[in-house]
């Protein structure tokens, strides 16, 4: 059975540092260290002088050796208190100090040689090899290292506490963020549930009204059929009688001809309207409601997809890239065409001949969205609606007259002639038309690579690093080769530009009606910038928001 820890500690205190056994007849020397009396007799003087303490190296006089009776009594008591009687005295000390015994002398290592960096026992310390060296007690030599370790431990404990604090705070932040996400999940579900409920109610309301109309039409159909069948039966009877009368002999026929024809006078037969005018009117109103529903859902879907999928960004124009033909507002969000080259200094990044300008902020990833408003003098909503109404009336008149639908929208597209006329055009006339198209008053909105050419005449097409729409009073074109003419339902006053860099698309929409106008597809490898081009007096391009 093992000895208790306090008893073992006492055993170490009453162990002689020389013989490593219990102190037998313990005595103290001048320096205060205690050894067995017999062990002190083995300590010889140094170089003819006085002997020195094996532990602290202080000289002492053997005549001053004094017994320590209290310690001797303590040794006896410890021996009596030993639990493990089978263990010999000093065995505990040896068990605990085996790893600290001198390999040569099997003595306890009390000293540390600072010259050789080795632990020494008393015998090694007195040997010829280490006697000239600086040797100190192991406890004293270990103290600086212990202090360094303790300081390092203190630093590590502070770091541990900081990490634990950061970890606790991080865990709290994570839990808070998860709570936010859970709350947002519930809000999303509630929002969609509310939307589903609203749409379901509107759907049921419209379907109920439509069912009532269907019932009215069905009831009218029964009445119409019943009355028509009655009229047909009456006419069938009259026809049958008249057919029989017509087959009678002449004498019999002429007996009551006057009375017979009087009985069957010719009446105006019934022609009823199968559908009441009020029902037709309400059906037409339903058609208008359906168009409004489709338009509203299209606008809602477009805006929702844009807001959820794309990040709306605020962009500004780069004045260093602006052509001398253009004038920028102070906030760099509006550009106008001056018609005169007003720049006295040509910046390296400036468009030289083309009236173009780039945005100040570029994009190399993500999905972003911004808008460009085309503000044209004389473009009022009333005028546009009037033009569309007049155009619709003209188209109806043309259709009634046997003509095909026109090409117009807004101001209308001109029909330049028949296919035969187009085929008869020479190469020179085609080149003249291309030149006329190039100088056509118009504007372009889109995106461009940051490396797009700025000098000389440019085509500003996708192969040149520009993906843009061209707008004019005559129509809209995708600036491709060849140009693709577009026919949106409405002329856009505000063009939405949605850039999906990773997806490789640039999508243009009518920002007001959410109508899709055109989508470019490409693989982007460089930074893309907003791009505006304006050669249209009286027109301003404004970046939104």
Curated annotation (Swiss-Prot):
Annotated GO MF terms: ubiquitin protein ligase activity; zinc ion binding
ZnF B box-type span: 97-138
Post-translational modification: Autoubiquitinates upon viral infection. In turn, autoubiquitinated TRIM26 recruits NEMO and bridges TBK1-NEMO interaction.
Binding site for Zn(2+): 102, 105, 124, 130
Region Disordered: start-end pairs: 376-440
Biased composition (Acidic residues): 380-401, 412-440
Domain of life: Eukaryota
Catalysed transformations (reactions): S-ubiquitinyl-[E2 ubiquitin-conjugating enzyme]-L-cysteine + [acceptor protein]-L-lysine = [E2 ubiquitin-conjugating enzyme]-L-cysteine + N(6)-ubiquitinyl-[acceptor protein]-L-lysine
GO cellular component, one term: cytoplasm
GO biological process terms held by the UniProt record: host-mediated suppression of symbiont invasion; innate immune response
Zinc finger (RING-type): 16-57
Localization (cell): Cytoplasm; Nucleus
Subunit structure: Interacts with TBK1; this interaction bridges together TBK1 and NEMO in order to activate TBK1. Interacts with INCA1.
PANTHER family named in the record: E3 UBIQUITIN-PROTEIN LIGASE TRIM
Name of the protein in question: Tripartite motif-containing protein 26
Species per Swiss-Prot/TrEMBL record: Sus scrofa (Pig)
């Amino acid at each position: 059975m093992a000895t208790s820890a306090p008893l073992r500690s006492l055993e170490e205190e009453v162990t002689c540092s020389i013989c490593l056994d219990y102190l037998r007849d313990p005595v103290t020397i001048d320096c205060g260290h205690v050894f067995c009396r017999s062990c002190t007799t083995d300590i010889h003087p140094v170089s003819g002088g006085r002997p020195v303490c094996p532990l602290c190296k202080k000289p002492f006089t053997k005549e001053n050796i004094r017994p320590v009776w209290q310690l001797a009594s303590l040794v006896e008591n410890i021996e009596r208190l030993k639990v493990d009687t089978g263990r010999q005295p000093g065995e505990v000390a040896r068990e605990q100090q085996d790893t600290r015994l001198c390999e040569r002398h099997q003595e306890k290592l009390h000293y540390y040689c600072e010259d050789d960096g080795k632990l020494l026992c008393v015998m090694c310390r007195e040997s010829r090899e280490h006697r000239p060296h600086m040797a100190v007690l192991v406890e004293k030599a270990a103290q600086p290292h212990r202090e360094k370790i303790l300081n390092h431990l203190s630093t590590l404990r502070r770091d541990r506490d900081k990490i634990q604090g950061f970890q606790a705070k991080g865990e709290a932040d994570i839990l808070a963020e998860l709570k936010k996400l859970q709350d947002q999940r519930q809000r999303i579900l509630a929002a969609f549930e509310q939307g589903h409920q609203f749409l379901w109610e509107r759907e049921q309301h419209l379907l109920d009204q439509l069912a009532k109309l269907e019932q009215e039409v069905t009831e009218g159909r029964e009445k119409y059929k019943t009355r028509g069948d009655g009229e047909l039966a009456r006419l069938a009877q009259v026809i049958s009688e008249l057919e029989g009368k017509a087959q009678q002999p002449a004498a019999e026929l002429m007996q009551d001809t006057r009375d017979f024809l009087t009985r069957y006078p010719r009446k105006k037969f019934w022609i009823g309207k199968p559908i009441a005018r009020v029902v037709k009117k309400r059906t037409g109103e339903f058609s208008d409601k359906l168009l409004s529903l489709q338009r509203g859902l299209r606008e809602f879907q477009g805006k929702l997809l844009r807001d959820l999928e794309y990040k709306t960004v605020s962009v500004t124009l780069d004045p260093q890239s602006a052509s001398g033909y253009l004038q920028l507002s102070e906030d760099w969000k509006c550009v106008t065409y001056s018609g005169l080259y007003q720049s006295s200094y040509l910046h390296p990044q400036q468009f030289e001949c083309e009236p173009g300008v780039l945005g100040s902020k570029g994009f190399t990833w993500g999905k972003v969205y911004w808008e460009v408003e085309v503000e044209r003098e004389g473009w009022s909503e009333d005028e546009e609606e009037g033009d569309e109404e007049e155009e619709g009336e003209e188209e109806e008149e043309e259709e009634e007259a046997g003509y095909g639908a026109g090409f117009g929208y807004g101001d209308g597209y001109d029909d330049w002639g028949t296919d035969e006329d187009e085929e008869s055009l020479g190469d020179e006339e085609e080149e003249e038309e291309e030149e006329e198209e190039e100088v056509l008053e118009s504007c372009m909105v889109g995106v461009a690579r940051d490396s797009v050419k700025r000098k000389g005449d440019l085509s500003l097409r996708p192969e040149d690093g520009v993906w843009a729409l061209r707008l004019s009073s005559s129509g809209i074109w995708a600036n491709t080769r060849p140009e693709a003419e577009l026919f949106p339902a409405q002329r856009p006053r505000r063009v939405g530009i949605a850039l999906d860099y990773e997806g490789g698309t640039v999508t243009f929409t009518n920002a007001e009606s959410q109508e899709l106008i055109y989508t470019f597809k490409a693989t982007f490898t460089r930074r893309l910038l907003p791009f505006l081009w304006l050669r249209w007096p009286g027109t301003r391009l404004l970046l939104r928001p």
